[in-house]
C-alpha cells in the first residue's frame, strides 16, 4: 500500500508527490481497536489509546503521545532488545487485562486511587467502552479530520501578526469557549496531540475547531485523569467543580475599531 506525504504550514497542506511513501525508523506507531480500517467507521467496542498510554506510564514506559486510537513511541539507536521486550510484555499484559475484564483498580491503580470516587467499581472494559462510546457520540475522529481540510478552516479576519499585537496590548477578554462562537481568537489554539495549530491568531472561533475543543472539554469532565495537553485554551474549575475551557478573544470594542463592526 502507498500513501502521500504532506507538508503542513498552518492551514495549507500540499501533496509532495503521488504514490510516494516514507517510513521513519525512529517512530513506532500502533493503532488500537475501535475504528474499522476498511470502512473508517466506529466499531461497537474500542480501546482508546489514552487508556493504553496511562497503563504503560504506570509500568515504566513513556509513549511520546497518544490520540484517539493511535499511540506513538520514539525510538533511538540506544534502544536495545530488553527495552523492546519490556514494551511488548506490557502491551501483552494490558491485552490480558482487557480480555479478562480486570478491575480498573488492578490495571490502573495510580489513576484509580487519584479518582476513586469517579471510577469506583469500574473494570477496564467498562472504562474502554464508555470512553469509546463518548468519542463515537461526538464523532470526534471526523471533527479532527475536518479541522485540517480547507473547506472547514476558520474564517480569518486579521493576520496573525496583527492579532498578536492586540494580544500584547491587552485588547482582549477571556471568555468561556462555549460562548466563543464568532469571536476573534488572539492566541494559537493547539491540542496535543496532534500538536498542530487548529486556530491561528486572527481567525474566528466556530465550526469544526470549536466543536472539537468543546468535545475535549466534555471528555475532560467525563474522564478525569485523561486530560490532553492544550495550548491557547485554558481549563479552570468553576464553582460547581466542573472543568471549563476558556480562550482569549478580541474585545467587541476593538473588533468594531479594526473591522468596522463587531462580529
PLM feature spans:
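Non-catalytic terminal extensions of PLP-dependent enzymes
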Residues: 1, 8-263
Amino acid at each position: 500500500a502507498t500513501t502521500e506525504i504532506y507538508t503542513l504550514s498552518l492551514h495549507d497542506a500540499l501533496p509532495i508527490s503521488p504514490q510516494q511513501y516514507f517510513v521513519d525508523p525512529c517512530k513506532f506507531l500502533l493503532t488500537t481497536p475501535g475504528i474499522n480500517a476498511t470502512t473508517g467507521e466506529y466499531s461497537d467496542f474500542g480501546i482508546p489509546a489514552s487508556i493504553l498510554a496511562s497503563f504503560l506510564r504506570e509500568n515504566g514506559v513513556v509513549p511520546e503521545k497518544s490520540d484517539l486510537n493511535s499511540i506513538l513511541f520514539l525510538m533511538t539507536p540506544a534502544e536495545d532488545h530488553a527495552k523492546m521486550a519490556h514494551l511488548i510484555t506490557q502491551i501483552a499484559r494490558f491485552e490480558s487485562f482487557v480480555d479478562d475484564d480486570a478491575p480498573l483498580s488492578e490495571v490502573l491503580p495510580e489513576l484509580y486511587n487519584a479518582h476513586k470516587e469517579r471510577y469506583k467499581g469500574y473494570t477496564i472494559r467498562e472504562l474502554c467502552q464508555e470512553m469509546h462510546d463518548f468519542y463515537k457520540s461526538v464523532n470526534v475522529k471526523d471533527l479532527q479530520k475536518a479541522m485540517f481540510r480547507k473547506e472547514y478552516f476558520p474564517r480569518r479576519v486579521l493576520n496573525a501578526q496583527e492579532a498578536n499585537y492586540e494580544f500584547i496590548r491587552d485588547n482582549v477578554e477571556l471568555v468561556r469557549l462555549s460562548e466563543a462562537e464568532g469571536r476573534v481568537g488572539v492566541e494559537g489554539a493547539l491540542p496535543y496531540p496532534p500538536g498542530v495549530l487548529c486556530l491561528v491568531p486572527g481567525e474566528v472561533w466556530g465550526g469544526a475547531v470549536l466543536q472539537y475543543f468543546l468535545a475535549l472539554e466534555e471528555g475532560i469532565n467525563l474522564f478525569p485523569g485523561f486530560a490532553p495537553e492544550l495550548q491557547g485554551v485554558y481549563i479552570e474549575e468553576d464553582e460547581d467543580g466542573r472543568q471549563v475551557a476558556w480562550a482569549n478573544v478580541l474585545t467587541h470594542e476593538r473588533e468594531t475599531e479594526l473591522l468596522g463592526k463587531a462580529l
